Amino acid sequence: MKKVIILSLMIVSAFSVDAQRKRTRTATSMGNVVVRLGLGVNSKKVDPDLDPVYTSTAVHFKPSVGYMVVDNLELGVNFGVNYMTSEDVYVQSPTISKTMYDATDVNFGVYVQKYFPLNNWFAFTTSADLGLSTGSFNEDDVLGSVVTPDRARSGNRNGVGGAINFGMAFTPYNAFSLQANIAGLGVQNQKSDYDNSNDTVNTTDAGFNVWRQAYSLDFVWYFGRGLWKK
């Protein structure tokens, strides 16, 4: 009888240890693979009582792949596409006069992100990234049906920059998280080459929310042993 009781206790203990081991493995445990999709859309319209109307739309798309090198520390690579278009109407009648602008930038780089868990659901995050960007921009002057490219305001640009961002992570499920950066401190150096000139223009920006659009909403999936089991 004692042997049966001892054997039963050993079995229960084994299952309890295994269950505890599974429970202690979280989304940010060492060895997990992280797939992140960042997406942002911003729209603006300024419409005073008179003719002038200004509208703009910006779309930001940034996927990344990372690896948890140790618990709560993620290292990875990212890739991003930013697109922006705007229309600045000066006169609507009798003949419309406006300026149309669009720009596309592609960026890629490396990043590291540290998690500071508050509980099983929430965590503070701090991330640092460094990367390169390249893109083009174009502006057209429109008068009625006549479109004239503005070569003085069109061209190509390349840059390098880095940032430290601060945010929050919400993990409703062990293998999925919603994350948002709420503040960032960055620096960016950019060289613009305008179509009507062989000279480049160097621009350096530094301050809050400069590099990589610190405000963002990320959808994050974690892949690792036992994360997707019920």
Residue ranges, per PLM feature:
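Short glycine/proline- and aromatic-enriched beta-strand/turn motifs that initiate or cap beta-hairpins
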Residues: 20-78, 88, 214-230
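Predominantly the C-terminal beta-signal and adjacent terminal strand-loop region
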Residues: 84, 88, 169-230
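Flexible, solvent-exposed loop segments that connect beta-strands
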Residues: 41-55, 80-106, 132-158, 189-208
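Helix-adjacent hinge/juxtasegments
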Residues: 99-107, 112-121
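Hydrophobic core residues within well-ordered beta-strands of beta-rich domains
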Residues: 33, 59, 73, 106-108, ...
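Residues on the lipid-exposed face of transmembrane beta-strands in outer-membrane beta-barrel proteins
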Residues: 37-41, 63-67, 81, 108-114, ...
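Short coil turns and loop connectors of transmembrane beta-barrels in diderm outer membranes
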Residues: 3, 29-31, 71, 118-122, ...
